[in-house]
């Protein structure tokens, strides 16, 4: 009698197998849903600083922060404003007040005296020519 009782149990197991497969599929989809939620939570989590100073390919791609900073060169850190050097106050007057303004500022236009000397050197140069 034991043998006929085992046969119906095995037939019941075969009927229950598709149900167990669907429950396994439900577990798998729930696991995927949890993984998706975890990925989204990581995406919206603020980036953590990384103290790795290496710029090799492996280190550039090991976290999102390194990829932005090292791989793409994007840095969102707040840069401090540069301080201007304080202007030095002049305690003494300019040493050459008799020079013209153009010579003090380094103006490239020559004065009349310089023009005359240039013309004189051109006229006196009587080298071999045409």
From Swiss-Prot:
Renumbered to this chain, region (Disordered) spans 1-29, 79-130
Where located?
A: Host nucleus, Host nucleolus
GO BP terms: namely: positive regulation of viral transcription
Mark the residues carrying the PTM Phosphothreonine: 85, 89
| Residue numbers bearing the Phosphoserine modification | 94
Q: List the disulfide bonds.
A: none
Region entry Cysteine-rich, spans: 50-66
Skewed-composition ranges (Polar residues): 11-28, 99-111
PTM statement from Swiss-Prot or TrEMBL = The phosphorylation by CDK9 does not seem to be important for transactivation function.
Classify the source by domain of life: Viruses
Q: Which InterPro entries match?
A: IV_Tat, Tat_dom_sf
Q: Which Gene3D superfamilies match?
A: Tat domain (4.10.20.10)
Query: Domain annotation text?
Result: The Arg-rich RNA-binding region binds the TAR RNA. This region also mediates the nuclear localization.
Family note: Belongs to the lentiviruses Tat family.
Oligomer and partners: Interacts with host CCNT1. Associates with the P-TEFb complex composed at least of Tat, P-TEFb (CDK9 and CCNT1), TAR RNA, RNA Pol II. Interacts with CCNT2; the resulting complex is unable to bind to TAR RNA.
Q: What does this protein do?
A: Transcriptional activator that increases RNA Pol II processivity, thereby increasing the level of full-length viral transcripts. Recognizes a hairpin structure at the 5'-LTR of the nascent viral mRNAs referred to as the transactivation responsive RNA element (TAR) and recruits the cyclin T1-CDK9 complex (P-TEFb complex) that will in turn hyperphosphorylate the RNA polymerase II to allow efficient elongation. The CDK9 component of P-TEFb and other Tat-activated kinases hyperphosphorylate the C-terminus of RNA Pol II that becomes stabilized and much more processive.
Q: What is this protein called?
A: Protein Tat
Species name for this entry? Human immunodeficiency virus type 2 subtype A (isolate ROD)
Gene name for this UniProt entry? tat
């Amino acid at each position: 009698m034991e043998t006929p009782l085992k046969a119906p149990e095995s037939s019941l197991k075969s009927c229950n197998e598709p149900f167990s497969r669907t429950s396994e599929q439900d577990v798998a989809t729930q696991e995927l849903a949890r993984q998706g939620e975890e990925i989204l939570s990581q995406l919206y989590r603020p980036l953590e600083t990384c103290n790795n100073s290496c710029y090799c390919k492996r280190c550039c791609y090991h976290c999102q922060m390194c990829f932005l900073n090292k791989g793409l060169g994007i840095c969102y850190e707040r840069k401090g404003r540069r301080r201007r050097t304080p202007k030095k106050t002049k305690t003494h007057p300019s040493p050459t007040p008799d020079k013209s303004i153009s010579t003090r500022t380094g103006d490239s236009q020559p004065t009349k005296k310089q023009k005359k000397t240039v013309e004189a050197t051109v006229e006196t140069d009587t080298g071999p020519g045409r």
